[in-house]
Amino acid sequence: MMESLLQTLLNGAATGGVYALVALGYTLIFSVLGVINFAQGALFSLGGYATYLLMGGRIGVNGAWPGLGLPVALPFTLALLVAALVTALASLLVERLAFAPLRRRGAEPLQSLITSLGAGVVLVNLLQILMGAEGYAFPAGAEALAGLPDMLILAGARIRTIQVLLLAICAGAVVLLSLWLERSRSGKALRAVAEDFTTARLLGIDSDAMVRLAFALSGVLAGLGGGLVGLSVSLTGPYFGISYGLKGLAVLVLGGLGSVPGAIAGGLLMGLAEALVPADASGWREALAFAILFAVLLLRPGGLLGRIQPDKV
Amino acid sequence: MIDNGLLVQMLLGALLGLSVYLPLAAGQLSLATPAFYAIGGTLAALLSTRWALLGGGADGSLPLPSLLLELLLAALLTGVLAALVGGLVLRLRGIYLAIATIALVEIVRVAILNLPFTGGAVGIFGIPQPFADASGYLLPVLGLLILAGWLCQRLEALPLGQAMAAVRDDELAAECLGIDTTQVKLSAFVLSAVLAGSTGVLAAHFLNTWNARQGTFDVSVATLAFVILGGSRTWLGPVFGGMLLTALPELLRPVGDARLVLFGLVILLGPVLAPQGLITPALLERLGSLGRGAGR
């Protein structure tokens, strides 16, 4: 009993770590531009499929070119990093197509919710046409991670190495990001732009470059998340990232829009809450995040660690 | 090329477009239309297959008054639900409405999939038919569309419609003018929900089967594309967009697989290339003066 509870909690924390990555991706862009990038979930999918293909995975029977694959077979860690680079570039493309033209025109921020949703829908459906709707497991041997065993024994419980690794990588990414935001020169510049777009520009900070930086970083987070989920759970069709993206929105509201610690705490809480849903109600698990979202809106609209910012005139 | 069945689908698309248009006319991005559409359809499917009082015959027929009763009940249910959800969300900034309505669509989808009486993944089938064939549906669907269009047209002259336009153009300014902006946004949201719910009732009978796939995130995207293509400055925009984008994938078969790519491109590029959509008030004015010129 103890053993299974520990496993459940660790599973929940691992999923929660991924939710935190998604929510942080939203938070980076929200704090700079005050809008949500609805394409985040699709970038997450792209990260998973890019990792799969870079590891030597082939397109399945329902894809556009069955049996075709990249002429490379990278080890998982390397594939994950290259995939994160791919999603960073894709995220920059999303900024270029869905955000930059509207920002230049001074359009309503609401408009970029619509355009980024469009970018995400195009991306995920192109993936669907290319790869088919079928599920993919990562190539055999992927689990043999740098000589680590498949299972670890922790306090008498058998735990999948990948879960621990996933949590460690999420934690590492979060810590690095926070340190960078707090300490580095460009991190400070990014926070200055987040505080006040125009003033930062007057102070000589290249605001547009900072916006691109925020998109590239959130793309990296999406790529890491997608690749890690692909390895630990498998890819369940191109829409798997959308599902993480939607739950990331609930996490965002739970933690408080624009709050970095809120995104992390909200992600972990959400992952644990889902893991504790009993097996005979598992069909309802998908709705739990959104039920929590409404509860938060009812009880504490600013989120756990956020505050509602009044609109500026 | 366009048979009666497709024409009914196009009109249903126009109705869903109007449902997305109404909150947008008050500057609010709501993606909840599929949730209320799914609730309306599920209600109709449940009532007409389970409730003997409605008189669903063994031959699969349904008396017309029963259809009207379903419409009334669906409008009531979705209206109350929208008032509850909207009351929770609409005092916050616009982004919260977009997020909360996505959440609502997911909750309703999971509920329809998991509730013990909605038929699970298969759904409810053999829904009784109030009309003998597709052409019979033209009249009620067109009737609902005319009613909704008339309402939208009337709104432009009524205080509520003018307040909606004021909130869309500048919410803070509208508030300073003494407009109860939350109330205005809520009214638009409830109207949108009632329209989507009623459309769901007609769609459930027309389609003959109903399941959780009728109200998904994809439908949010499709219905949003209707409005972005047609334009949200006049109610004719979403009607045009809904009819065109419903017909297009059916008429161009090869597009079938890629229809969501098409919808995605519309909402990615639309706000950049044609911020007002294809049907703008200026265009209507030009058409109007052309018509007068020809008549003279």
Predicted regions and their residues:
Chain B
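Transmembrane alpha-helices and adjacent helix-loop boundaries
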Residues: 1-296
